[in-house]
Curated annotation (Swiss-Prot):
Keywords: Secreted, Transferase, Ubl conjugation, Ubl conjugation pathway, Virulence. Residues 137-171 are annotated as: Disordered. It is found in: Secreted; Host cell. It comes from Salmonella enteritidis PT4 (strain P125109). Ubiquitinated in the presence of host E1 ubiquitin-activating enzyme, E2 ubiquitin-conjugating enzyme and ubiquitin. Effector proteins function to alter host cell physiology and promote bacterial survival in host tissues. This protein is an E3 ubiquitin ligase that interferes with host's ubiquitination pathway. This is E3 ubiquitin-protein ligase SopA.
Length: 782
C-alpha cells in the first residue's frame, strides 16, 4: 500500500523529513503489519465485546521516528486509535467473519496516510513560510485557517482537502446548502468540506423558499462559516439572511436581491456586488472586508472594515463605467452627469435616504481621511461635469446635508465648491419658508439641515430680521428637537441673543413680558414667551409668544387657540379683541395663514348661516354674520328697532310656537349630513349650533351689555330644546338645562346674559364632545 505524495510540497520539506517520508513508504511497501507486535490478546468475538461493553487493549510497537513525526495532540489521537483496533481470533461463532492481521495493517496504513499528509501540509506553513491560501487564508499550528491581521476579520473557512463531486445545477446546489445548513442548525459540527460551496451556482434561487422561516426572522438562525468563494448568486434573493464568518471572495452578486441581508465577520473581497434595484432595505456589513469589491452608490457601509487600496484596476462592467476609490472599495459613478444621474446618485432626499453621498458618509469616523478623499473625487467629477445651477438646484439640500458637515468642511476643495451651492440653498429656504411652516423636522432634518441653516444665518445676520418667520422657526426646532445635539442648541441660543440685540427687535423685549421678564429668554420652560416675530409689513409691529404656542400655531389641531399671544406695537401690548386673526396673519404674520385657513375650512358653522340668510335675499346680512365669525368682538350691533324687526321676520317662520319647524330641522340634518346619524350625534351638533347663536346674541357680537336681539336668543334656545328632546344624556343635568333655558328669556328671575350662557355651554361641549364643537364653532370664537 502506497502513501500518495500529491498533497505534499516536498520542495519545502527539510531533508530529515524527506528521509522520514521515505522510511514510511518503505515500511508500507514491506507491509506495515509486520511491525505491529501484539502485546495483549483477548480471544473474544466482536459481538461479545459490544454486549459486555469491554474492550481488550492491544498495543502496537511503531518505529519511534514515525511516532515523533506526529504533533503532540495527534499522538494522543494515534494512540487512542491504535489501541481500539482489535485482533479478533476465531471463536467458532458461526457466521462471524474475523478481522485478519492484513485488515489491521490496512486500517493502520490508511490512518497514517491521512495524518502524515495533514501534518506535512501543516509543517509547510508553520516551518517554511509557504504562501497562504488564496484570499489571505493560511493554516495555523492547529490546522485552522486564519486571515491576515490588521483590520481584516478572522474569517474564511479553509479550502476543502478532498475533492467531491459537485452539484450540476442551481437547484442541486440549493439542496446541498439546505442540507448542510439544517445539519448545522441541528447542532452537528460540519467539516470544512461540508461548508465548502466554492464555485457554487445559486443563480435565480430564492433562499426564502429553500430555508426555514427562522433564517429570515430578526435575530433568527445564521448561516455560519461557509465558503462561497467564486460562486454565482446572479438574480438570486438572499433577503433577510444573516451570513456570519462566510467567504464570498471573487463571487458574483449581480442583480441579487439582498434586502436587509446581514454580512458579519465575512470576507467579501473582490466581489461583484451590484444588488438589484428591487432591494428595499439596504444590506448591512458588520466587521466585513470589501477589498476591490464594486459597490452600488446606494449602499450602507457603516460596519465595513477598510484596508489600504492596492494598485488594482477598476472592475469592468457592461457598458463601461466610471469609478472612485473609497479606501480599498470601488464605488461606481455615472459615465455622464445627466439629469437622471444627478437625481439618482445625489438626491437621497428623493430616493429613500440613498445616494453616493450617504454611502460615503455611512463609514465610521475613524475612516475620515478615506471619506474626505472620496468626496473630493466626487466633487472633482461634478466640477468636471460643468453642471448648471438649474441642474444642481434639486439636490442642493442633499449636498449641503452632507458636505456642509465635518469632516468634509476640512477640505478647501470641497468648501470652495460648496460655498455657492449653500448660498443658493439658503436663499431658497428664506424665500419658501418665511411665510409658511417648515416641514415637521425629523431626525434627518434636525441633524443635517438645521445646523446648516444656523450656519447660514450666522454668515448672513441681516436675514434674521428680514426673514424672522424662518429664523424663529429654525431656533424653535433647534431648541425643541429631540434629535438636535447640545452643540446645535448652544449655537441656536447664541444666535438668538444676537437677534434680540438688533435695533428692530430690542424695543419689544423690555416690557416685562418677554422671556424671564427682564428682556432675556428663559429656555428652561416652554411656557415662557421667548419668541418674537417681526411683522412682514410694519417694523413697528411684533408678535410675542411661547414655545408651546408657536409650535401649535405652526402645526395646529382643532383645539388650537389662535389668540394666545401678545400683539406689540412700539413694544406695547395691544388688544386683539377687534382684530380678525385671518387679516392679522395675512398682513403681518403670513407664516400662520395657511394653517389657520386649513383649520377654518373644517369649521362648518357657515352652512347654517347660508340656510337661514341666503345670499340672494339677505346678502348684506349674510356678510355681516360671516364677518362676525372672523373676530372675537364685533362693532356691528343689531339691537335697533329696524334690525330687531328684520331678524324677527326672518326667524319667525323657522320657529313656530318657539320650536324648530320640522322642515327647517330636516334642512339642518341634511346640511350637516346627520339624516342617518344617531339621536345623540344629532343632539350634539344642535347643542354646538345653539352655543354659536348664543355668542351671536351676546355683547361680544351683535348685542350689548343691556340688550340683545330677541330673535337670535330665541333661535339659540330652540336649538337647545331640540337637542334636549333628542338626547337629554348629553346635558350636565336637567337643572342645568332649565337654567340655560331661563337665561335665554329671563324667566324665573334668571340673569339674562347670553355671553355667560355661551361660555358655559362651550366649556361643556369642549369637555364632552370636543370634536363636534371644533367642527362647528368659528376659529375666532374658539
Amino acid at each position: 500500500m502506497k502513501i500518495s505524495s500529491g498533497a505534499i510540497n516536498f520542495s519545502t520539506i527539510p531533508n530529515q523529513v524527506k528521509k522520514l517520508i521515505t522510511s514510511i513508504r518503505e515500511h508500507t511497501k514491506n507491509g506495515l503489519a509486520s511491525k505491529i507486535t501484539s502485546v495483549k490478546n483477548t480471544h473474544a468475538s466482536l459481538n461479545e465485546k459490544l454486549k459486555t461493553g469491554k474492550s481488550s487493549s492491544i498495543e502496537f510497537a511503531l518505529p519511534q521516528k514515525i511516532k515523533d513525526f506526529f504533533q503532540p495532540k495527534d499522538k494522543n489521537t494515534l494512540n487512542k486509535t491504535l489501541i481500539t483496533v482489535k485482533n479478533i481470533k476465531d471463536t467458532n461463532n458461526a457466521g462471524k467473519k474475523n478481522i485478519s492481521a492484513e485488515d489491521v495493517s490496512k486500517m493502520n496504513a490508511a490512518f497514517m496516510r491521512k495524518h502524515i499528509a495533514n501534518q506535512t501540509c501543516d509543517y509547510n506553513y508553520r516551518m517554511t513560510g509557504a504562501a497562504p491560501l488564496p484570499g489571505g487564508v493560511s493554516v495555523s499550528a492547529n490546522n485552522r485557517p486564519t486571515v491576515s491581521e490588521g483590520r481584516t476579520p478572522p474569517v474564511s473557512p479553509s479550502l476543502s482537502l478532498q475533492a467531491t463531486s459537485s452539484p450540476s445545477s442551481p437547484a442541486d446546489w440549493a439542496k446541498k446548502l439546505t442540507d448542510a445548513v439544517l445539519r448545522q442548525k441541528a447542532g452537528e459540527t460540519l467539516t470544512a468540506a461540508d461548508r465548502d460551496f466554492s464555485n457554487a451556482d445559486f443563480r435565480n434561487i430564492t433562499f426564502s423558499k429553500i430555508l426555514p422561516p427562522s433564517f429570515m426572522e430578526r435575530d433568527g438562525d445564521i448561516i455560519k462559516g461557509f465558503n462561497f468563494s467564486n460562486s454565482k448568486f446572479t438574480y438570486s434573493d438572499i433577503s433577510h439572511l444573516h451570513f456570519d464568518e462566510c467567504r464570498f471572495t471573487y463571487s458574483t452578486l449581480s442583480d441579487v436581491v439582498c434586502s436587509n441581508t446581514k454580512f458579519s465577520n465575512s470576507d467579501m473581497n473582490e466581489v461583484f456586488l451590484q444588488y438589484s434595484i428591487t432591494t428595499q432595505q439596504q444590506p448591512s456589513f458588520i466587521d466585513t472586508t470589501l477589498k476591490n469589491t464594486l459597490i452600488r452608490h446606494k449602499a450602507n457601509l457603516s460596519g465595513v472594515i477598510l484596508n489600504e487600496p492596492d494598485n488594482s484596476s477598476p472592475p469592468s462592467v457592461s457598458g463601461g463605467g466610471n469609478f472612485i476609490r473609497l479606501g480599498d472599495i470601488w464605488l461606481q459613478m455615472p459615465l455622464l452627469w445627466t439629469e437622471n444621474a444627478v437625481d439618482g446618485f445625489l438626491n437621497h432626499e428623493h430616493n429613500n435616504g440613498k445616494s453616493i453621498l450617504m454611502t460615503i458618509d455611512s463609514l465610521p469616523d475613524k475612516y475620515s481621511q478615506e471619506k474626505v478623499q472620496a468626496m473630493e473625487d466626487l466633487v472633482k467629477s461634478l466640477r468636471g461635469g460643468r453642471l448648471t445651477e438649474a441642474c444642481i438646484r434639486p439636490v442642493e439640500s442633499s449636498l449641503v446635508s452632507v458636505l456642509a458637515h465635518p469632516p468634509y468642511t476640512q477640505s478647501a476643495l470641497i468648501r470652495e465648491w460648496l460655498g455657492p451651492v449653500q448660498e443658493r440653498f439658503f436663499a431658497h429656504q428664506c424665500q419658501t419658508y418665511n411665510d409658511v411652516p417648515l416641514p415637521t423636522p425629523d431626525t434627518y432634518y434636525q441633524q443635517r439641515i438645521l445646523p446648516v441653516l444656523l450656519d447660514s444665518f450666522d454668515r448672513n445676520s441681516a436675514a434674521m430680521t428680514t426673514h424672522s418667520g424662518l429664523f424663529n422657526q429654525v431656533i424653535l426646532h433647534c431648541m425643541t428637537g429631540v434629535d438636535c445635539t447640545d452643540g446645535t442648541r448652544q449655537k441656536a441660543a447664541a444666535l438668538y441673543e444676537q437677534y434680540l440685540a438688533h435695533p428692530a427687535v430690542s424695543p419689544h423685549i423690555h416690557n416685562g413680558l418677554f422671556g424671564n421678564y427682564d428682556g432675556s429668554p428663559d429656555w428652561t420652560t416652554r411656557a415662557a414667551d421667548n419668541f418674537l416675530l417681526l411683522s412682514s409689513q410694519d417694523s413697528d409691529t411684533a408678535m410675542m409668544l411661547s414655545t408651546d404656542t408657536l409650535l401649535t400655531m405652526l402645526n395646529p389641531t382643532p383645539d388650537t387657540a389662535w389668540d394666545n399671544f401678545y400683539l406689540l406695537r412700539a413694544g406695547e401690548n395691544v388688544s386683539t379683541a377687534q382684530i380678525s386673526p385671518v387679516e392679522l396673519f395675512r398682513h403681518d404674520f403670513p407664516v400662520f395663514l395657511a394653517a389657520f385657513n386649513q383649520q377654518a375650512t373644517q369649521r362648518r358653522f357657515g352652512e347654517l348661516i347660508d340656510i337661514i340668510l341666503s345670499t340672494e335675499e339677505h346678502g348684506e346680512l349674510n356678510q355681516q354674520f360671516i364677518a362676525a365669525t372672523n373676530q372675537k368682538h364685533s362693532t356691528v350691533k343689531l339691537i335697533d328697532d329696524a334690525s330687531v324687526s328684520r331678524l324677527a321676520t326672518i326667524f319667525a317662520p323657522l320657529l313656530p310656537e318657539g320650536k324648530l319647524s320640522p322642515a327647517h330641522y330636516q334642512h339642518i340634518l341634511s346640511a350637516y349630513h346627520l339624516t342617518d346619524a344617531t339621536p345623540q350625534k344629532q343632539a350634539e351638533t344642535l347643542f354646538c349650533l345653539s352655543t354659536a347663536f348664543a355668542r351671536y346674541s351676546s355683547s361680544a357680537i351683535f348685542g350689548t351689555e343691556h340688550d340683545s336681539p330677541p330673535a337670535l336668543r330665541g333661535y339659540a334656545e330652540a336649538l337647545m330644546q331640540k337637542a334636549w328632546e333628542l338626547s337629554p344624556a348629553i346635558f350636565p343635568s336637567s337643572e342645568q338645562f332649565t337654567d340655560w333655558s331661563d337665561r335665554f328669556h329671563g324667566l324665573h328671575g334668571a340673569f339674562t346674559c347670553t355671553s355667560v350662557v355661551a361660555d358655559s355651554m362651550q366649556r361643556h361641549a369642549r369637555k364632552y364632545f370636543p370634536s363636534v364643537l371644533s367642527s362647528i364653532l368659528p376659529l375666532a370664537w374658539a
